[in-house]
Amino acid sequence: MKPYQRQFIEFALSKQVLKFGEFTLKSGRKSPYFFNAGLFNTGRDLALLGRFYAEALVDSGIEFDLLFGPAYKGIPIATTTAVALAEHHDRDLPYCFNRKEAKNHGEGGNLVGSPLQGRVMLVDDVITAGTAIRESMEIIQAQGALLAGVLISLDRQERGRGEISAIQEVERDYGCQVISIITLKELIAYLEEKPEMAEHLASVRAYREAYGV
């Protein structure tokens, strides 16, 4: 586990974005942990979040020209990641996001920011069913741009309805790499370092046995 990944887990725990217990997911599964990125909701939270996203992007080595944040949750993520790349990595890159409702006055259209072109890195909080990615792909392809990759905060590494995860489906369908700041693997490695969290470790491991990919 890299230092920024450990720091991200601690940041998520401190903000109660990451919680352990028993949670019922939309899929009906009972999960021993829950991740709600909406609780990163202050200026300082966003500044830190952008640094973690930027770190993961640089670490991945994937080449891209522009950041795209799908409405709505992807918008602040794309913005703060663009700021962090410029401030901490000397990479001043354009960013763009979509509107859910097309505008027919002013500048019009359903895209805001830089022109959507070149190799696009899509940033979002999580991928649950991959629906947001599919909608974004339509927008990206309509502009003649290419999807270079997708970056999310957490990869739960669990099966969807079939034998593979929603993330693996996205990789298969669009031929792109999906990367994340952390995966379930790092989460388990973190729990293994913390004797006081042993009760959670057992339940997370059992969940991975049942639903992991």
Swiss-Prot record:
One of its GO terms (biological process) is 'de novo' UMP biosynthetic process. Belongs to the purine/pyrimidine phosphoribosyltransferase family. PyrE subfamily. It catalyses: orotidine 5'-phosphate + diphosphate = orotate + 5-phospho-alpha-D-ribose 1-diphosphate. The gene is pyrE. This is Orotate phosphoribosyltransferase. SUPFAM superfamilies: PRTase-like. Pathway: Pyrimidine metabolism; UMP biosynthesis via de novo pathway; UMP from orotate: step 1/2. Orotate binds at F34, F35, T128, R156. It comes from Klebsiella pneumoniae subsp. pneumoniae (strain ATCC 700721 / MGH 78578). Its EC number is 2.4.2.10. Keywords: Glycosyltransferase, Magnesium, Pyrimidine biosynthesis, Transferase. HAMAP family: PyrE.
